């Protein structure tokens, strides 16, 4: 507290959709009640929702634990983002309506810009939907390392985990050098036109 830092407790989840597809979502606790709901969701995902060792959430569990939680959409990896990128605007509106019904004034469309494929398409579609639906937005960054000069080390760790080498021309490149912990000033500059 003396350092001017406020702790925000939250968790990233994979959400199992009814059609067996997965999306990502982040929950942030607003209070002790929200924290209890968050821990209940984490426990249930591990105890009842594991698929191949991966804990997954189900919508019906979320409905029962929505009080005092804020939700970040998951960006292009969330259900709304996946629909937007696939050109399914009606499905995106429907997904957004579900979230805003269960989390009124507590659901935020994430805006991200890391120079990766599809980010600009998602960004423009998400802003348009947010304006249309009067949904708040939040600028986030998919942080994987602290500083830009740590990108190569991160890539080496990914290659080790995948059993590949850095010079393998066929290896997938899922990350960019822009996925570092940006300062507030950098984020404001990046999204100044929004």
Task: Indicate residue ranges for each PLM-predicted region.
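Phosphodiester-processing cores and adjacent nucleic acid-binding clamps
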Residues: 1-194
């Amino acid at each position: 507290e003396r350092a001017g830092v406020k702790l925000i407790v939250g968790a990233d989840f994979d959400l199992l959709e009814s059609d067996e597809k997965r999306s990502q979502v982040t929950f942030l606790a607003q209070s002790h009640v929200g924290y209890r709901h968050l821990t209940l969701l984490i426990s249930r995902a591990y105890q009842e929702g594991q698929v191949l060792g991966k804990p997954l959430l189900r919508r019906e569990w979320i409905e029962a634990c929505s009080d005092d939680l804020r939700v970040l959409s998951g960006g292009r990896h969330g259900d709304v983002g996946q629909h937007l990128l696939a050109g399914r605007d009606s499905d995106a509106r429907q997904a957004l309506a579900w979230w805003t019904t269960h989390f009124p004034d507590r659901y935020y469309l994430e805006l991200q810009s890391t120079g990766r494929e599809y980010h600009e398409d998602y960004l423009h579609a998400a802003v348009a939907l947010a304006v249309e639906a009067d949904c708040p937005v939040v600028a986030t960054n998919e942080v994987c390392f602290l500083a830009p000069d740590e990108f190569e080390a991160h890539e080496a760790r990914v290659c080790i985990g995948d059993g590949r080498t850095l010079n393998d021309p066929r290896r997938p490149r899922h990350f960019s050098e822009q996925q570092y912990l940006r300062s507030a000033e950098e984020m404001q500059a990046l999204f100044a036109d929004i």
